[in-house]
Amino acid sequence: MEMTSGSLGNGIPEAMGQNRGNIKRCLEKYIENGRRVMKLNELMDEMEIVINDVTQRRRVMEGDLGKILCFTQAVVIPPNVAFAVRGTPGNWQYVKVNSSNLSVEALSSTQYLKLKEFLFDENWANDENALEVDFGALDFTLPWLSLSSSIGNGLSFVSSKLGGRLNDNPQSLVDYLLSLEHQGEKLMMNETLNTARKLEMSLILADVFLSELPKDTPFQAFELRFKECGFEKGWGESAGRVKETMRILSEILQAPDPQNIDRFFARVPRIFNVVIFSVHGYFGQTDVLGLPDTGGQVVYILDQVKALEDELLQRINSQGLNFKPQILVVTRLIPDAKKTKCNQELEPIFGTKYSNILRIPFVTENGILRRWVSRFDIYPYLERFTKDATTKILDILEGKPDLIIGNYTDGNLVASLMANKLGITQATIAHALEKTKYEDSDIKWKEFDPKYHFSSQFTADLISMNSADFIIASTYQEIAGSKERAGQYESHMSFTVPGLYRVVSGINVFDPRFNIAAPGADDSIYFPFTAQDRRFTKFYTSIDELLYSQSENDEHIGYLVDKKKPIIFSMARLDVVKNLTGLTEWYAKNKRLRDLVNLVIVGGFFDASKSKDREEISEIKKMHSLIEKYQLKGQFRWITAQTDRTRNGELYRSIADTRGAFVQPAHYEAFGLTVIEAMSCGLVTFATNQGGPAEIIVDGVSGFHIDPSNGEESSDKIADFFEKSGMDPDYWNMFSNEGLQRINECYTWKIYANKVINMGSTYSYWRHLNKDQKLAKQRYIHSFYNLQYRNLVKTIPILSDIPEPPPLPPKPLVKPSASKGSKRTQPRLSFRLFGA
């Protein structure tokens, strides 16, 4: 974003005159160590060294320069210091200050990025023909949100803009409705009503006819009469429902308004079959949680599918249709499945009637790849995977899906490729964008690439987020961060990968494609610990052994001497970002906390040789060293990753029985599903202030925020709570109850599913309206994919397996089917190993 009149940059010269001496010393301190990139904490720390007088420091901080320093990063190239200033979420300005004469110059984002590149690749920075990526140049005709507070409310914004478009061109809606069909059957309208005028007149006549019928008259009773007038099924299951829907459409055609547009598209029969991509890790329903690259995303999707199917069934019924929705979760088939079902091609999803997991293998020139592949090494296999998956999906669904949803970088890229090929509405869900998790991973990509292949990943992320018709985020912070920290998507607005490309405009967080839809927790598993009649008593004995047995075995090490103490508990993957070793070290160093509570950690393996994940191996070794260094046995229990979700629900409640707490200490957490699970069980929760948990928890009301970068402060905050709750039992109860209330009001899967299906319906029409611009953008993306992504992927080694015995002849694919009775409680189909 350019520096504009009235911006912070224009106030700096005056501030320089008022605080010239202090500011000059401050800037001289910044350039003292030569060229470098400085983060906010470094800027503030070095300013405090130079301006040690508290009054003078406050004067500087209250001025324009202080405003800059509080929300910025800087590039130091003596004698200049260039600042990237974040005034509000999504709004960035750039300014360069000369430390010698304090002159100020406004910069463009391109100029600022070039200065940053100068530190890492001077030749690239000076290359006038260096590749610049500017997706924003293709979106100039579309409307944008304007206020930071409105970010993530894209659907409401689109509905408001549709009103103007429909007022100017109602025929576009008529054409869209005429295109609706499913399984070869026309829906809502036929060609008899091919103009807006004809439709308006017919709606008036239909209203008169319907007013004479009892509201509960089934649609079938007047279906033939309606068909003669140009109306097909899909308006509703009864005369009353049909009349309501038609009146909403009549009002839209006469005077469109956002509320009626929302109501109408919520009733349009547009979404029946959904494909969800989640490629990496071990995607399954049992025995997978805690395996490499396998965690909350799997839980999220399985719960998501149940909610979406329930919502679709309810909608299809209210539309007066008898179609059955189908949802396919498409993932990788892994022949070496580690005692999981990840080597089964087709698997019904428990708790659903019409939803299945479809697994497609990775295929190389040597055949099917049998071994697990890290999410960082997955990119060479995705193009072939997309092709094979598309063939199977079209076969199973007997046609195209109506909506494709991608998950994480790999799933989003595959979803983008397939949606573009088939012309289908596409949504993306990031879960986590790795660029924000690894500091300076863009400008220092050459250091990271041999291990993480971030050049391929960042390129794939740019492709998928710009291909999507709408983007689902769990929280505002995921998109645009907080006052103190930029959001995951916000960090992709402009950045540079020196030597590859300079992103002038990667994504705009004011884009109306962004929508917040927070997931919930499965309430059949995660319910309050006080609901004694619902609790899973069959797990009591095994959980007691898990927590309190004095023996050490392959499932738990360490022990708890004082069983009367409350337990603080954390459960996550054992990697650097999740920070379980960080929590352990906080606890180990805080004597007061150790005296008050026990610590139980659930995650990973004990034996590093059992892990194939690079980060997990490192964290395993670190955890063992902490146990020995601080002599934690007696107050500490380390339990291996637990894959039984039902027992995990009871584990949360068992911790609540001790009047303990759940602690989520991640350096960054995009959403925080375990936070939702813990609070749903009535467990008092402390969670990171970096990411989604900061929105889930109202600090000091429904739980507590902790700072993962300040272990001493965080551990003291936990200790303070337990000291108070030890003196006043109602103090613990208050936070438990407030946490439950917060979940019930804001975080349920029913709310989520309703939002997502509404998005799918409305954005399908928005896509129809903007198809020419969509095509132009796809051509730009196609070039970027072919000229950049494909070449980057070639640098990633293709894995190979030890030669296996010749495969058995393939058998025909068994298509999914479901009985008309109750929902599945266990698999009922026979399966074969894909390609074997």
UniProtKB/Swiss-Prot annotation:
Reaction equation(s) it catalyzes: an NDP-alpha-D-glucose + D-fructose = a ribonucleoside 5'-diphosphate + sucrose + H(+)
Stretch forming the signal peptide: none
Main localization category: secreted
Chain positions covered by the region annotation Disordered: 805-836
Entry GO MF terms: sucrose synthase activity
Stretches for region GT-B glycosyltransferase: 270-748
GO biological process: callose deposition in phloem sieve plate; sucrose metabolic process
InterPro entries on file: Glyco_trans_1, Sucrose_synth_GT-B1, Sucrose_synthase_pln/cyn, SUS_EPBD, SUS_N
EC numbers for this chain: 2.4.1.13
Similarity remark: Belongs to the glycosyltransferase 1 family. Plant sucrose synthase subfamily.
PANTHER family in the cross-refs: PTHR45839, SUCROSE SYNTHASE 5 (PTHR45839:SF4)
Name of this chain's protein: Sucrose synthase 5
Source organism per UniProt: Arabidopsis thaliana (Mouse-ear cress)
